[in-house]
């Protein structure tokens, strides 16, 4: 490296552990937080450093972790099998980093709250001190379960794990976060100096601090005032608590950007969701996936929206489920509407109570106000779909399309037996079962003629049984 140049950074993320306290058949690091795998949050923070390489050390259910994270070209994997501790895990990355120099930043796949600012602070402090190793520590009120930072004359001397700590060491409030920066040059040789003489019979990465001190390699610390960012996830309750923090952070970001969230504690908005200014979100709303909500819209209580695009000035009333749907400006949906994937709802269109859409286009100004199923349908502009209308799209083997052209009027309790087309401006009489195309401007009616039988009720009363 030329003088003054920052050495390259390499990130290693440990993600090999089983996570037995999760009591799960799935890899711990793949459990979702705000719609993304736990480890994906760590990866995003790692990428804020623009590292030369990112290596994920996998072990328990390694194939599943690889599959879940496939398609990320900057990510390489190293296998730890069997799992024999954190130092052993880091050693497995040596092959992937052979011939590399610079700074290695070590992260844990189950610590998703770490901020990019703290990570940058770690790297900057490490470079400024020309340290062999730099450890992120935190001051906590209840240090139980964490490795303690033992200092001599103010400098870090060693890290002692809870199981191996003396009563005096257990009283120490400064804990190890499991987040480190290392100079790569002495690292691999130092790792080979670690022994497994501890209560667990494992190779502890924390032993590196003592080894570095004995070898005269400077060890520095970056001390955090709280452990909020560095909390790990080892149980379902910890997963729930971290998820709550991530959701709270997301809600606060949206509110700071001009979104009204009436009750943030009961509002679930995933990490990938975007919401425009002056939109109002009521209690119990769930926004998932890559959903986008425009400006000045209103999403009422207990509605769930997944991977959908909601335009400006859209109203979604209570208890709707909207999946994979695009809704244009000024439209209204609900209450109790179910929009399955593949719909496009036009400007100022209306979908009312107990209406279900599937792979349907509803044109601008059209309305289906109540009690209808519209599937595999293309509906033009300014169409009225009466209550109880059903597009009968399935013949038992295949799905068929229904086309309703601009300005048509579909009377209540109508069945449209697909494939069928209702032409521009045509009317369909209420109660009809339409099996043939209705031409533009025509009236289509297909029902039995009404017959009134005079005096029938009185005669029925006189019939003796």
Kindly give the residue locations of the regions a language model identified.
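Short beta-strand segments
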Residues: 14-15, 57, 106-108, 136-139, ...
């Amino acid at each position: 490296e030329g003088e003054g140049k920052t050495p390259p950074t390499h990130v290693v993320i440990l993600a090999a552990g089983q996570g037995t306290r999760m009591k799960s058949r799935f890899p711990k690091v793949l459990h979702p937080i705000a719609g993304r795998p736990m480890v994906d949050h760590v990866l995003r923070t790692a990428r804020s450093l623009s590292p030369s390489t990112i290596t994920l050390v996998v072990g328990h259910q390694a194939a599943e972790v690889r599959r879940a994270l496939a398609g990320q070209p900057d990510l390489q994997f190293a296998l730890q099998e069997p799992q024999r501790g954190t130092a052993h895990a880091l050693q497995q990355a040596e092959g992937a980093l052979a011939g590399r120099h610079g700074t290695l930043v070590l992260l844990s796949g189950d610590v998703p709250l770490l901020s990019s600012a703290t990570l940058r602070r770690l790297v900057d402090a490490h470079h400024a001190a020309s340290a062999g190793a730099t450890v992120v520590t935190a001051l906590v009120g209840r240090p139980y379960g964490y490795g303690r930072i033992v200092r001599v004359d103010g400098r870090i001397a060693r890290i002692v794990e809870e199981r191996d700590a003396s009563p005096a060491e257990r009283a120490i409030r400064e804990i190890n976060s499991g987040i480190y920066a290392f100079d790569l040059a002495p690292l691999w040789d130092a790792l080979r100096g670690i022994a497994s003489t501890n209560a667990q019979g494992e190779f502890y990465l924390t032993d590196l601090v003592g080894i570095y001190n004995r070898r005269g390699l400077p060890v520095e610390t970056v001390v955090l005032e709280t452990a909020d960012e560095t909390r790990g996830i080892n149980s379902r309750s910890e997963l729930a608590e971290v998820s709550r923090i991530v959701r709270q952070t997301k809600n606060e970001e949206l509110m700071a950007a001009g979104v009204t969230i009436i009750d943030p504690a009961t509002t679930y908005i995933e990490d990938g969701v975007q919401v425009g200014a002056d939109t109002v979100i009521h209690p119990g709303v769930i926004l998932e996936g890559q959903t986008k909500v425009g400006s000045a819209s209103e999403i009422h209580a207990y509605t769930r929206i997944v991977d959908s695009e909601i335009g400006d000035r859209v109203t979604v009333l209570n208890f709707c489920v909207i999946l994979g749907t695009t809704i244009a400006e000024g439209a209204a949906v609900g209450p109790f509407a179910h929009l399955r994937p593949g719909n496009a709802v036009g400007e100022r269109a209306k979908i009312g109570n107990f209406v279900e859409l599937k792979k349907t286009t509803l044109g601008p100004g059209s309305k289906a106000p109540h009690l209808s199923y519209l599937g595999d349908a293309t509906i033009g502009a300014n169409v009225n779909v009466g209550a109880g209308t059903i597009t009968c799209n399935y013949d038992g083997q295949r799905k068929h399309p229904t086309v309703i052209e601009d300005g048509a009027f579909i009377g209540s309790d109508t069945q449209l037996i697909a494939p069928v087309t209702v032409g521009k401006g045509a009317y369909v009489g209420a109660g009809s079962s339409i099996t043939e195309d209705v031409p533009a401007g025509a009236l289509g009616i297909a029902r039995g003629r009404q017959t009134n039988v005079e005096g029938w009720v009185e005669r029925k009363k006189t019939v003796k049984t």
